[in-house]
């Protein structure tokens, strides 16, 4: 391990295999806190490479609790969090709407990073159990088209890094790993990142990890497809990556100010999204979810974003998406 430390302290990049070896030791709790802090900061200052990020993700996936991976096509829709906008839980709502549109979503998530309510906080407020077994979650995915995988339940090795991360009080590689370590290992993913500089590197990382099709997005300060500003996209499709920009108009949607998407505490967000998913919500909220669902559906081969957004809006207005929330809660 010492040779890897010395390599990092010379500001040299690790290979994918070296990164996997190092992070396997981290999740086993084999590094001293001072060593872990030095590793994370040296990588941060130099800038983590896609190979290093992929190696770290592979180490955490190898250490994760097993999930019975389905053989049908399914996706994740998830953000890094930490964008500081304190918005409503767009990706969580989008998962239920996408399932209503007929696709399968295994959403990986955690407690809040920067907002007052992360996806897990919101689901708990809806009465959805965070500690469902992997088998129960797989059945929900089969039957309802949506399940939620609570990161700490599958990634116990994360706890070894937590004290150091809390003391450092700065973003490190761990802040981008969450969306890359879904234990169900989906072949498709829509991933939001907190910084535009991460869009292409994370898409390159998804290529290394073997994703079939994926889109990495950052929109006007948000780790989502935005309806207040252009969204930067890097789309991976069978090994090739295309970078482009999307505007709300590309989805046939109106623009709304970022302030229209302000969220609150988990109970407030629950009430906002309950109204939305029952077809009684704010038009800005519906548009934000429709844009994200539309891009997710594109990953399934539905290439027309305007048509996809319209399909999502119809599902939102029908109230069918909320039926999946109550059905998932009833499985507790």
From Swiss-Prot:
Please list the cofactors this protein needs. Answer: Mg(2+)
- The residues the record assigns to binding anthranilate 1 are 79, 110
In terms of superkingdom, the source organism counts as Bacteria
Per UniProt, Mg(2+) 2 binds at 223-224
Q: Which residues bind anthranilate 2?
A: 165
* Pathway(s) this gene product operates in, as recorded in its UniProt entry: Amino-acid biosynthesis; L-tryptophan biosynthesis; L-tryptophan from chorismate: step 2/5
Residues the record lists as binding 5-phospho-alpha-D-ribose 1-diphosphate: 79, 82-83, 87, 89-92, 107-115, 119
Family designation = Belongs to the anthranilate phosphoribosyltransferase family.
Q: Which PANTHER family match?
A: ANTHRANILATE PHOSPHORIBOSYLTRANSFERASE (PTHR43285:SF2)
**What job does this protein perform?**
Catalyzes the transfer of the phosphoribosyl group of 5-phosphorylribose-1-pyrophosphate (PRPP) to anthranilate to yield N-(5'-phosphoribosyl)-anthranilate (PRA).
Q: What's the protein called, per UniProt?
A: Anthranilate phosphoribosyltransferase
- Species the sequence originates in: Yersinia pestis (strain Pestoides F)
Q: What is the lineage of its organism?
A: Bacteria, Pseudomonadati, Pseudomonadota, Gammaproteobacteria, Enterobacterales
């Amino acid at each position: 391990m010492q040779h890897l430390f010395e390599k990092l302290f010379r500001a040299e990049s690790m290979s994918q295999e070296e990164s996997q070896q190092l992070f396997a030791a981290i999740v086993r709790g084999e590094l001293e806190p001072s060593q872990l802090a030095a590793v994370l900061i040296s990588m941060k200052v130099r800038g983590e490479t896609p190979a290093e990020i992929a190696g770290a993700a592979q180490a955490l996936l190898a250490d994760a609790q097993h999930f019975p991976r389905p053989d049908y096509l399914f996706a994740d829709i998830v953000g890094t969090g930490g964008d500081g906008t304190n918005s409503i839980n767009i990706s969580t709502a989008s998962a239920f709407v996408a399932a209503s549109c007929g696709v399968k979503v295994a959403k990986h998530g955690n407690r809040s990073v920067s907002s007052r309510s992360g996806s897990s906080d919101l689901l708990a407020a809806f009465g959805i159990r965070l500690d469902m077994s992997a088998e129960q979650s797989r059945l929900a995915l089969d039957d309802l088209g949506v399940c939620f995988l609570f990161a700490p339940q599958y990634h116990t090795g994360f706890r070894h890094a937590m004290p150091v991360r809390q003391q450092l009080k700065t973003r490190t590689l761990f802040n981008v790993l969450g969306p890359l370590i879904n234990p169900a290992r989906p072949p498709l993913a829509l991933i939001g990142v907190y910084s535009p500089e991460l869009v292409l590197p994370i898409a390159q990382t998804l290529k290394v990890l073997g994703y079939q099709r994926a889109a990495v997005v950052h929109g006007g300060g948000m780790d989502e497809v935005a309806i207040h500003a252009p969204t930067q996209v890097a789309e991976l499709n069978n090994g090739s990556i295309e970078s482009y920009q999307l505007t709300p108009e590309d989805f046939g949607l109106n623009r709304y100010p970022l302030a229209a998407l302000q969220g609150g505490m988990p109970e407030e967000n629950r009430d906002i999204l309950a109204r939305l998913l029952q077809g009684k919500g704010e038009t800005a909220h519906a548009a934000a979810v429709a844009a994200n669902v539309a891009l997710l559906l594109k990953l399934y081969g539905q290439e027309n974003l305007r048509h996809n957004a319209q399909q999502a809006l119809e599902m939102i207005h029908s109230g069918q998406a909320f039926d999946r929330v109550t059905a998932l809660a009833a499985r507790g």
